[in-house]
Swiss-Prot record:
It is found in: Cytoplasm. The lineage of its organism: Bacteria, Pseudomonadati, Pseudomonadota, Betaproteobacteria, Rhodocyclales. It catalyses: 5-[(5-phospho-1-deoxy-D-ribulos-1-ylimino)methylamino]-1-(5-phospho-beta-D-ribosyl)imidazole-4-carboxamide + L-glutamine = D-erythro-1-(imidazol-4-yl)glycerol 3-phosphate + 5-amino-1-(5-phospho-beta-D-ribosyl)imidazole-4-carboxamide + L-glutamate + H(+); L-glutamine + H2O = L-glutamate + NH4(+). Heterodimer of HisH and HisF. This is Imidazole glycerol phosphate synthase subunit HisH.
Amino acid sequence: MSDVAIIDYGMGNLRSVAKAIEHVAPGKRVAVTSDPAVVAAAARVVFPGQGAMPDCMRELDLRGLREVVKTAAASKPFLGICIGQQMLFEHSEEGNVPGLGILPGGVVRFPDAKMVAADGSRLKVPHMGWNEVCQRKPHPMWEGIPDNERFYFVHSYFVAPADAALVAAESDYGTRFTSAVARANIFAVQFHPEKSAQAGLKMLANFISWAP
């Protein structure tokens, strides 16, 4: 049995996630896997990914991973990253596709009308680079991470939870958006902890020790 299963549905380079977790938890068994049985048996699950939402949902289903993701998200420490966060919600404007429906709400694109910086210059989409993450509620995943710490983002869409109680952090890029959500055993982030230097490594270490 793996201590941590990183779900591989063919979207994104997952080795960087695995290497970061192995760095903070050298004694743990980390599996990058597309095998539903390995995911089901793991103590903790990481659901990362990059790419377009329609492609991600299709590849997830082609590998028969939909149900095991839903089961894991209901039963064990579960970390969603980037598109892995977005897929947890009910619907995405990207391709007008349904998500997994694990969390209430949708996924929306940065509004063009608001993509203006304080100096009047246009903000580019995708939002790419370092940005502050403002913590909106206490959570064990924030342990040792200062409020307004900077994390690394690459995205054109963001989650819009239907339940405000889900919001664990917000960030600003032309508009204020939800950058982390939390409910029970689920914690999911829009940014990339594996690309976010020491703060990101601390978050991954927190995930390894988190006991929801």
